[in-house]
Amino acid sequence: MIARGRVLNDTALKSKAMFGFTVLKLVSRHIHHTPIIFQEKKDAQVDLGVPWYLRQENSPPVEEIKKVEIPELPESAPGSLSELVHLIAEEYGIVDVEVFDLATLPEDHPKSVDVQSYDKYIILGTGKSEKHLYKAAYELKQYIKHHHDCMPVIEGMVSNSIGKVARRRLAKRVSRGPPATHSTYGIGANTWVSCDTGVDGITIHMLTKERRQEMNLEQLYSDAPDYESNRYTNNIDDDDIFYGIKRGFHTSTRVFNKADQLKVVYDELLENGKTKSLAKFKAQFDNLFSGASVEEYNRKVDFYKVISLMDEQLVTAEQVECIFKDKYSSLLLAQEQGIDWHMEVTNDIIKYMELLADVGDQYTPAQKLNKLSEFVSDMTNFTGDSVQLFSIDKFNALLWNLTTKSTFNQLDSAGIREVINTKGKFEPVVGKVEQDAKIERCVKELTRRSLPKEVFPLWFREQMMYTYGQTGAWDKFWKEFQSLVQSIGSSKDRVYFWVTTLIFLSKVNNRDALRTYFTKYWSSPSGYSFLKDFEKNDNRFNSDNERIVFKRTVQDIQNSYGSSPWKDEAVEFVENL
């Protein structure tokens, strides 16, 4: 035994001298696991006729195979949902699978089927590694292609053929900007793979464990704001000596306290701010602002924007725009660790678009888009990576909004929903909206080409319809209206659409448009009509609020156009409600 150990130790030393530490580790591992044959005493139960490597005591312990957990699926779900869930869990090894039925979300939820009709079911799952996700995504793509005869749209799947040299070059490009240890910038590929299957409205998200903790998509697709948030968060005690190291920042506790103080001032401004007191609020905010965190800069953008909308002389739109530039040129933030700059850039582009939309008629549509183009160019140059803006619903909505010019915000689906929720007490301001026809065509085509299957979702077509109505383009309005009515699958949803359309027309208050609604679509014997869908929906509205607002809307139209016979049938209908 002693002689054998000396021989192997000598071999290890020679290996270290000739080949370095790698072979040394292999030899050491061999020494550790090699059984001792020359024992002074042998176990009496050992069968000497069996080679040592086949003996039971030298076999590794058998690990029990964990049973794959399949989440409970909605009863009304199509068979394809169960098929894909079992496929990724049982065949591809994706764990912690969760399924979200977007039809169960409330109407005002940003991911509900009432707001967007493309996604109906969301599947979330965790992969073991980036390579695992790449392999699973590749197999999933081939499976859907051959079994469902459609080509899924997959994002985040990057081939492993990117070599070390290319990755080093990407890293050098990123290093020119502030450090961003939590942002991939195209280097950490396949940490989040999204697959729009094209099958029954099913979208699959597969992420690594770390990426899933960071993104917390569960909150996005759940009605509960704190949905299992503790499941994918690290439990780090503030008193832990490694608190800062684990979080990846230096003095963030102090910084967050400062950001909280700024939030108090901001909330007080929203609640109690008046024109005469704006300067006092601004002075208080500026005195607290230190610029030591992205949270402070983000709060400053929101704060200054509110003041600018209330008093353009105190804070101009250009001053709000300068805050973004100050944020990305800050030396303090450049030294801060743990900032997801990719996420910050995406959010700031959206905020900048909101600013351009809120300034009213200060800029023409062409000027707005030129300013947006310059801003996006500056931001993407900073990140060193492209930002997939057209995959964000709010970006598409705001981009369409920027094709118009108006002194007030347009009436949209959110405003109409507020009218219903308040039983008609909310009165939106509606007036003339101008739209640049050339820019409208360009933005519409650009958006269409960027969408899956180049098909506009229903919510976007509804937004276009509302814009056409407020710009007076009634031919386009009724074209979109007819297309939407035909695309809505159930009579229940169409009843809601009939209600919202009438509310919109009553607020715009165009006589010809109202007459078209009541003469062509109220009780048409051929094609779609309100009365047909109302009867199919068991002669009822979807809520008491809808019934109350619909009745009041028809009565208001009667008061405005009392002598016109084209709405008499509707007036008689609501009298019996």
From Swiss-Prot:
Coiled-coil ranges from the UniProt annotation: none
Domain of life of the native organism: Eukaryota
GO cellular component labels: mitochondrial inner membrane
Membrane topology: Peripheral membrane protein
Function according to Swiss-Prot or TrEMBL: Probable mitochondrial mRNA stabilization factor.
PANTHER family associated with the record: ATPASE SYNTHESIS PROTEIN 25, MITOCHONDRIAL
Family per similarity comment: Belongs to the ATP25 family.
Stated name of the protein: ATPase synthesis protein 25, mitochondrial
